[in-house]
Amino acid sequence: MRIMGLDVGSKTVGVAISDPLGFTAQGLEIIQINEEQGQFGFDRVKELVDTYKVERFVVGLPKNMNNTSGPRVEASQAYGAKLEEFFGLPVDYQDERLTTVAAERMLIEQADISRNKRKKVIDKLAAQLILQNYLDRKF
């Protein structure tokens, strides 16, 4: 069963996919969106869902450090609800506190990637970390 992990922002969605057995996550790509104009990237998500035969989504919840919910949590939950309605697949949520920080640290310390290049891959890596945390929690 393949699971798709999503790191939802207001302008981009980082996408990751699990292996068929659900043990590991791999970052795929970053989809450009525009929340204000109602463009959620679902055409591209559908292509990926069909290609990888996705059966479930995991959306990151960017909670505050004190475990409270802010406007981005609400936006992520709204995106998840739209996914569920559009695709008819179950949506789970995963706490994503510090995943972007961890992703950036990995890119700086382990890969020594420049700031400009980091911006191009950070959301994809964050989605991978969100999905991997979810998979680790399940097994």
UniProtKB/Swiss-Prot annotation:
Secreted as UniProt keyword: no
Similarity-based family: Belongs to the YqgF nuclease family.
Broad class of the protein's primary localization: cytoplasm
Source species: Streptococcus pneumoniae (strain ATCC BAA-255 / R6)
PANTHER family according to UniProt: POLYNUCLEOTIDYL TRANSFERASE, RIBONUCLEASE H-LIKE SUPERFAMILY PROTEIN
SUPFAM superfamilies cross-referenced by the UniProt entry: Ribonuclease H-like
Protein's UniProt keywords contain Cytoplasm: yes
GO molecular function: nuclease activity
CDD domains named in the record: YqgF
NCBIfam families, alphabetized: RNAse_H_YqgF
UniProt note: phenotype after gene disruption: Probably essential, it cannot be disrupted.
Cellular compartments annotated: Cytoplasm
Keywords tagged on the record: Cytoplasm, Hydrolase, Nuclease, Ribosome biogenesis
Protein name as it appears in the record: Putative pre-16S rRNA nuclease
InterPro entries to which the protein is assigned, alphabetical: RNaseH-like_sf, YqgF, YqgF/RNaseH-like_dom, YqgF/RNaseH-like_dom_sf
Function: Could be a nuclease involved in processing of the 5'-end of pre-16S rRNA.
